[in-house]
Regions:
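Signature of extracytoplasmic/envelope-associated structural regions
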Residues: 1-295
Length: 295
C-alpha cells in the first residue's frame, strides 16, 4: 500500500471544542463549537520516560514511563467571538463557559489524502491565554494548555454533532471603535495591546495510571502591554502616582464584546522614544491587573 504525506490543507473539520460533563468525559450527545477562524494547532505528548541503568555495563537495562504523561496543546487563531477564550480568561466559579469546565478538543484530517481521521484530546484546560490587537490588523489569540489523554486517532466517525468551519469575519482592533481602549473612563488612541492570563495549572497524578487524575487551575496572573499615541500626561500621571485604574478594551462594539481589567498597576514605562522618522510619539507601558472579565 502506498502512502502519501499530507498538509494542513487536508483538514476536514477545523479544530473545535465541547464542554465535558466530568473531567475527561464527554456528555452523551456532545455538541462541538468552532474555536475561531482558521486555527493553527500543535499537539505534544511527553511520556516522561526514565532510563534504568544496570551495574557493570554501559547499556540501560530498560526504559520506563514514570509519572503522568504531559500532554500539551498550542492554538493560535483569529477570533470571530470570545467563546473559546473565556475558558482561559474568566475567573473560577462561573460554571459553564469558564475554566470550571474541562474541554474535549477535536479535529479531523484526510490521512493519505483519502481517509478521514479524527484527532481527539480529552481533559483540556487552558494555561496561558494571550489576546493581541494591533492597529490595521485582525485580533490574534493564542491559547496554550494541558490535557489528560490523547488517544490514538480513529478512522471511525465518533458520531458527534460537529461545528462548521467559521465563515464570520475575524475581529479587528478597529471593531472596538475609534478609541477601543478606555482607562478610568477616558478614551485613548491605542496602537497595540496585549493581555496575558496565566492559570498556573497543577497536574494531580493517580496511582496505577499514566494519565492525570485531574488538572486544576491555581492562582490567576494577568499581565500585558499597550501602546498609546502620546497626547496627554494622563498615563504618566497614573504611573507616577501608582494609581490603580480600570481598563476596558472594547473588542467589538457591534457584538458587545469587552475585556475589563480591574485594579490595574502600570509596572513599567517600556518606552517613550523620540525619533524624527517616527510618524507619532508612542508611550508603551507594561501592566499587571488584579482581575479580568471577558464578555
Amino acid at each position: 500500500m502506498s502512502t502519501v504525506p499530507i498538509g494542513a490543507w487536508m483538514t476536514v473539520k477545523e479544530l473545535q471544542y465541547a464542554e465535558e460533563s466530568s473531567y475527561g468525559v464527554l456528555p452523551g450527545s456532545p455538541v462541538f463549537n468552532s474555536v475561531g477562524y482558521e486555527p493553527r494547532v500543535m499537539f505534544r505528548v511527553d511520556p516522561k520516560m526514565l532510563p534504568i541503568y544496570q551495574p557493570g555495563t554501559e547499556d540501560t537495562e530498560t526504559i520506563q514511563s514514570a509519572a503522568a504523561r504531559e500532554i500539551t496543546w498550542d492554538i493560535v487563531y483569529r477570533p470571530t467571538d470570545t467563546g473559546f477564550a473565556k475558558y482561559g480568561v474568566n475567573s473560577q466559579g462561573g460554571g459553564s463557559g469558564t475554566i470550571d469546565k474541562s474541554l474535549t478538543l477535536l479535529m479531523s484530517v484526510k490521512l493519505n489524502a483519502a481517509t478521514e481521521t479524527w484527532i481527539i484530546l480529552n481533559g483540556a484546560r487552558p494555561e496561558t491565554t494571550s489576546i493581541t490587537g494591533r492597529a490595521g490588523a485582525n485580533l490574534e489569540i493564542r491559547v496554550i494548555g494541558k490535557g489528560q489523554s490523547f488517544p490514538i486517532p480513529t478512522q471511525t466517525d465518533p458520531g458527534y454533532t460537529y461545528a462548521t468551519s467559521s465563515s464570520a469575519q475575524p475581529i479587528q482592533l478597529k471593531d472596538g471603535g475609534l478609541t477601543p481602549l478606555s482607562i478610568d473612563g477616558l478614551p485613548y488612541d491605542v496602537t497595540n495591546i496585549t493581555v496575558n492570563v496565566e492559570r498556573n495549572l497543577s497536574t494531580i497524578a493517580q496511582p496505577g495510571s499514566h494519565s492525570a487524575m485531574i488538572i486544576i487551575p491555581q492562582n490567576r496572573q494577568i499581565t500585558g502591554t499597550f501602546g498609546i499615541a502620546w497626547e496627554t500626561l494622563g498615563l504618566l500621571t497614573i504611573l507616577g502616582t501608582l494609581a490603580a485604574p480600570t481598563m476596558v478594551w472594547t473588542l467589538s462594539a457591534a457584538l458587545g464584546l469587552t475585556l475589563t481589567l480591574n485594579v490595574t498597576q502600570f509596572t513599567k514605562l517600556n518606552s517613550l522614544s523620540f525619533a524624527s522618522e517616527d510618524p507619532a510619539l508612542i508611550e508603551n507601558y507594561a501592566y499587571q491587573a488584579s482581575t479580568a472579565s471577558l464578555t
